[in-house]
């Protein structure tokens, strides 16, 4: 009887869990961007609240709020209406499913994924009385074993390993194999770890002590190798075998529970622009896991997949059966609800969504046993013969255990080891109650408090040397680093020589008295909480003194806080999420920079690294703050060479530095080729600061001449810029006061010429620090596609530049005038170093006038490369002018209609003149008749003359419009020559034709207005005397 022939197809089950705010997030005033409704989880973009993304998963757990502690410290819902999900809820859904699969003979795998600090370890291991999935699964397994019938013999084997930098460390072995344990492959078994220690267990207490022992070894290894646990994967494996004594059948199940490394490492290591971005192996496992999941998801969607990259990393080799193979797999994605973690949380959700599509093919693992093999020794050794290949599960048991003895012997050996550990643990607990001691504090909460160093009466030395009372390996720890003295009920600490000791965030140089719960950092980043004498202790909550507390205290002591970064405006309690994220980055990178500096010192690389906040005091051309980001300034000691690394690039280099440093510790060899050295980069230009020159005077045709400070990223003066901007004629003659305009709209549609003249740069600190350096300046204006740079100037603290550039806006738009009124010209100062290439710009995308001046306000032009678009883009603007002229023509037609009305009135008056009073006719009948006839003739003649004049004016105007329309049609039909050499003359010709057309339109309209005004005036002059 073998495996079930028909495997069961199961999708990977995906659960998501949202944790409460961390203390750091609370201090920063973070906002929650996640919501859950009916199994759906939504995340809102803090920069655009209308952008909401919704995901659906198998299980969702809201653990963010709505909870309280019971009398045992267990977190429970605060009221019946609370949707809070505690550890017991997670175990009920996930843990019991794992146990059910194990009892039925299926392999089961649990993966915890998420960024560092998102709550992965809390869900897997738990904290205090809030036990996580791993201890609950193990405890429930043994509780169920105790209830089983007599004819079943269960066997439980336990192992615990860590994967860091593609090396496997056995966390249950006190000896470290050089280069780590090896992964082997067998055609029947698949991948397995050769030499991994498997410990037989007969109760949960043994597993609990093994986890504690493994955590202690992991913490010690992390300190010795300077390898943060957040960058390693921890895998706990349980081999559970059920031997049915009455049916000669064995069921076997592998339970793998994996706490993956922080997922943010995967994204950060892909530093854009870093020549060594593919060099680090620290992140290879997590990247490969993502590639495997993506390939399997594509396969499940019916896409053609040629290869599943299981072999790309150690982790994916060991998880091959868990992903797409023989296992029932659950992935729990841990999420931070804070707005400052939005990008990482969204990335985790997308990762989990892909994993949901992966399908496994789980089978029940069974193996037949001969009746003669029911004895314990035959159980482990009975398949050495030819039948072993037919029953790989049993053969695996032989490989792992056969050479170690029978099951009973293995249990006895494990029992003796456990008793020794229990005795040592009991002794340690006694000392904790009576002696002051140091508790380690780690970035991983599960490793905090694992190490305890006791301070006995008298002097107690700390350092690398084995002769010290406290032997501490770690970055920046000297052989004799510091001394703790326990005397007369007081404990003091004093650093040796120049060794680094920090107490409560402040470096100390002399003997310092310690108080209960003081925070101590030895070397680069070995953090400890001092626990005083029993009389000093109370019912304190030590959990609040976590890794974040240490780093925030350290940052505050160095003058870095939310307020110094400008996160909160005066009188405004709402913090900017993007700036809060910068503060979080700064605090996270602080210990990494300290460690990198220490590695540089020990490896004799001669580099000094310091954190900076880019754009801390910088603003854009309108005066608004630019987006801030953390960067690392790297300086070479002696030569004063400088590099600026982005956050992502620094993190990537830090990984590579750790690999080189680890090799140095193992072999004392730190040699590496220059191109592969993470401490080296080719020289490059360095941004020193920016100066703002406000352009408002230019909008009024006024010259401005200023001396403006270049401010660096810290807001301090780097140099002073002397610049002059002068409005001028197309020929370059400066305008005088008589050309000044009060209203900038007077310049609308007109040509504006001006010159920028950079005179000199004064007091350049960059050049004061090293006389061999040089500088360049660069600036752009309005819609200019490229930045213009001055020529390089070397070895002068007050360099004269004397560079002038002539700009022209051929028809100033409203937007350009608004730009001049409200914006500044930003001039950037760049530092040059010997051996680096100066900055330059291509002139291909710059449009020039016929005089050779640089054109701005050219939004209607696409580029010289596509000159055919120039005319077509200009056409709508010309049609707008024609439309305006037609409207004015319609107005003149209204005037014409009014004049015709007056004409009718005059004719009526003439008729009335024929019916004058009879008395007047009798007195002088002949004279009256002649006078009336003469007046009528004059009125008619004047009317005819006015109509004729108006008709002629309109005729002339419409003739002009006909010419204008003809020119417009020619412009539309005209196409540029294919010869590139003829492009510039063609553009000039087109510009001249447009100018001629504009002049024609304006002159035609002006003449029409003048003619009509003259006609109206003459009509009024004649009508007024005739009406009197």
From Swiss-Prot:
- Where does the UniProt entry say this protein principally localizes? mitochondrion
Keyword terms, alphabetized: ATP-binding, Coiled coil, Membrane, Mitochondrion, Motor protein, Nucleotide-binding, Transport
The cross-references to SUPFAM superfamilies, in alphabetical order and at most eight, read: P-loop containing nucleoside triphosphate hydrolases (SSF52540), SMAD/FHA domain (SSF49879)
* Domain of life, per lineage: Eukaryota
- Per UniProt, residues of the FHA domain are 460-523
Chain positions recorded as ATP binding sites: 114-121
**GO cellular component assignments:** mitochondrial membrane
Q: How does it sit in the membrane?
A: Peripheral membrane protein
One Gene Ontology term of the biological-process aspect is: mitochondrion organization
* One Pfam family in the UniProt entry: Kinesin
Q: Supply one GO molecular-function term.
A: ATP binding
Q: Where in the cell is it found?
A: Mitochondrion membrane
**Coiled-coil parts of chain:** 873-902
Q: Which PROSITE patterns match?
A: KINESIN_MOTOR_1, KINESIN_MOTOR_2
Residue stretches making up the Kinesin motor domain: 11-358
Q: What does this protein do?
A: Microtubule-dependent motor protein required for mitochondrion morphology and transport of mitochondria in neuronal cells.
- Family membership: Belongs to the TRAFAC class myosin-kinesin ATPase superfamily. Kinesin family.
Entry protein name: Kinesin-like protein KIF28
The organism of origin for this protein: Mus musculus (Mouse)
